[in-house]
A protein has these predicted regions:
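Active-site-adjacent substrate-binding region
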Residues: 107-147
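Long, well-ordered alpha-helical scaffolding segments within enzyme catalytic domains
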Residues: 30-40, 107-124, 177-208
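Acidic, Ser/Thr/Pro/Gly-enriched interdomain connector segments
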Residues: 201-243
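Conserved acidic residues
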Residues: 70, 243, 266
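Conserved hydrophobic/aromatic packing and binding residues within compact polymer-binding modules
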Residues: 5, 230, 254-257
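Active-site-adjacent mobile loop/cap segments within catalytic or ligand-binding domains
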Residues: 4, 12-15, 22, 74-81, ...
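Catalytic-core regions of hydrolytic enzymes
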Residues: 2-111
Length: 281
């Protein structure tokens, strides 16, 4: 299972009028890294839309970065205008607009319905959470109908066939919510809760393997860690060359090893595969 996380905005963006030290972009960046770490504990492969907090990527391109993934998440906090508003304090999760009743529509909506109340409870917001979609007036998918998703990141995800969500973690125009989001311990709670909901939704269980400090490997990777992987596979009797290049033969050996050990045979070496290779299951 592969998830793409987007930290909404970049640099120093969307300063809070309620707590001037808060920038939405800072919170999004911290939270997306924490969520990545928590999801990986369940065996998810997690990619992000960019590696540098200070570099931007177009909205549609961010959604399209989820190509080949099972889920796209864009993390945010919301705002009511540009001034303080203490009355509006709720969590909103936007799912794909249901314009054609596809499976990705249904999955994004179903997960949104699971996430919204949990995030709301963890954050202790004033008002009930909202699960919604928003229709725009564009024709991104080229079907001739001007009814696609209003949000470009979700359009990008839809165009590559990925269920997508925008998660608005209440409002940075509200003082209490903003201060809550500035606490790193609270962000850790959020990441754990969101990862738990997502893992349950996809039927993933938290791995009980130790932290090995080993990178996830896949076809195309090279280097000493790939060479070590190949040596381990050779030791188990799989036929491949120990050359430090993760090519088709190495991928085939990994997939065969995974099948023989009742693991997901995806030819990606993550925590569970490393643990099995090293006899730590």
């Amino acid at each position: 299972m592969r998830i793409c996380i987007d930290a909404g905005h970049y640099g120093k963006y969307n300063r809070s009028p309620a707590v001037p030290e808060y920038y939405e972009s800072d919170m999004n960046w911290k939270l997306h890294l924490l969520l990545k770490k928590e999801l990986e504990k369940y065996g998810f492969e997690v990619v992000t839309t960019r590696a540098d907090k200070n570099k931007d990527l177009g909205l549609n391109a961010r959604g399209k970065a989820s190509k080949g993934c099972d889920l796209f998440l864009s993390l945010h906090s919301n705002a009511v205008g540009s001034s303080v508003n203490e009355d509006v304090d709720y969590v909103a999760v936007y799912h794909l607009y249901e314009d054609d009743g596809t499976d990705i529509d249904e999955r994004s909506k179903a997960l949104a319905q699971k996430l919204a109340p949990v995030i709301s409870r963890v954050m202790g917001v004033k008002q009930a959470p909202k699960v919604c979609s928003r229709r725009g007036s564009g024709d991104w998918n080229g079907d001739g109908v001007l009814n696609d998703n209003y949000y470009s990141v979700l359009n990008g995800a839809r165009l590559v066939g990925t269920p997508g969500l925008i998660i608005e973690h209440s409002f940075h125009t509200q003082t209490r919510a903003t201060k809550w989001l500035m606490d790193d311990q609270n962000l850790e709670k959020l990441a754990k809760a969101e990862a738990e909901v997502i893992a349950e939704f996809y039927g993933m269980k938290q791995t009980k393997t130790p932290e090995l400090g080993l990178p996830m490997l896949r076809q195309g990777d090279t280097g000493g860690t790939v060479r070590a992987l190949q040596a381990l596979l050779r030791g188990y009797g799989y036929s491949l060359t120990v050359d430090g290049i993760f090519g088709p033969k190495t991928a085939n050996a990994v997939e065969c090893f995974q099948e023989d050990n009742d693991l997901d045979a995806d030819a990606i070496v993550g925590p569970l595969t490393w643990a099995a290779l090293m006899g730590l299951e």
